[in-house]
Regions:
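N-terminal metal-binding scaffold of metallo-dependent hydrolase/deaminase domains
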Residues: 1-38
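Short amphipathic alpha-helices and their capping/turn segments at secondary-structure boundaries
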Residues: 38-48, 104-117, 203-220
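Active-site mouth loops of central-metabolism enzymes
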Residues: 61-74, 136-144, 168
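Histidine/acidic residue-rich metal-binding segments in metalloenzymes
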Residues: 115, 143-232
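Flexible glycine-/small-residue-enriched beta->alpha junction loops
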Residues: 125-150
Length: 232
């Protein structure tokens, strides 16, 4: 491998190094330190600033292409590369509320890119959301929570389904045999959004998620997430 070195201002997890070094072996970062701690030959000082890549967990597209409408992996890859050019290094592709047939097709297409390490995973925004708080989601395709459809979508994602936005107040969203159960058992995380829920339902949903996460082995964290703090 070829060693290369960058010099500039480094924004790290817990500090900023005003004059630092990033050393690479090929495409792998092998060292990050201040210039004063670097034993090798440092490049000329520069006014460049280097930051960690953005981890984007909710993205619908870019570069003239959208994940919800991408019928081929090649079309979806246009959006992936557009964000990568601008500093996003891990990207989760988000679908929107659509028919079951469309969602299944998109899941299979996006799973191809995830298998090729172009995407970090897949997020479904809907279709089990609130008509009252649908925002930009097409109300035509909003349906009641369906655990069987959820399991089918997870299977279509081939292990790359990360989360699904749903409204916790809807019937069969949470509890035994629910969408939340299917998500957690399938390695994905329930996420709230486009919801008209009250605090009682929300607390019940949180309690159920904690209980279910404790019962299964999963790569995900044991907490539900929130897609939107405002529903639209």
């Amino acid at each position: 491998m070829t060693t290369s070195v960058l010099r500039g201002r480094l924004v790290l997890e817990d500090t900023v190094v005003e004059d630092g070094i990033i050393e690479f072996d090929g495409a792998t970062i092998t060292r990050v330190c201040s210039v004063s701690d670097y034993e090798g030959e440092a490049p000329e000082a520069s006014d460049a600033t280097y930051l960690p890549g953005l981890v984007d967990v909710h993205c619908h597209g870019g570069g003239g292409e959208s994940f919800p409408n991408a019928e081929t992996a090649e079309a979806a890859l246009v959006a992936v590369l557009e964000h990568r050019r601008h500093g996003t290094t891990s990207l989760v592709a988000s679908c929107v509320t659509a028919s079951a047939e469309v969602l299944r097709a998109r899941a299979k297409t996006l799973a191809e890119l995830a298998k090729a390490d172009e995407l970090a995973g897949i997020h479904f925004e809907g279709p089990f959301v609130s008509h009252e708080r649908c925002g930009a989601q097409d109300p035509t395709y909003i349906v009641d929570p369906d655990a069987d459809l959820t399991r089918t979508l997870i299977e279509d994602c081939q292990g790359y389904a990360l989360s699904m936005t749903l409204a916790p107040e809807k019937p069969n969203a949470y509890g035994p045999g629910s969408v939340a159960e299917a998500l957690i058992d399938g390695g994905a995380v329930p996420s709230w959004g486009h919801t008209d829920s009250n605090s009682v339902k929300a607390r019940e949903a949180l309690a159920y998620s904690r209980e279910r996460f404790a019962q299964v082995e999963t790569k995900r964290g044991p907490r539900a997430t929130i897609t939107h703090l405002f529903n639209g």
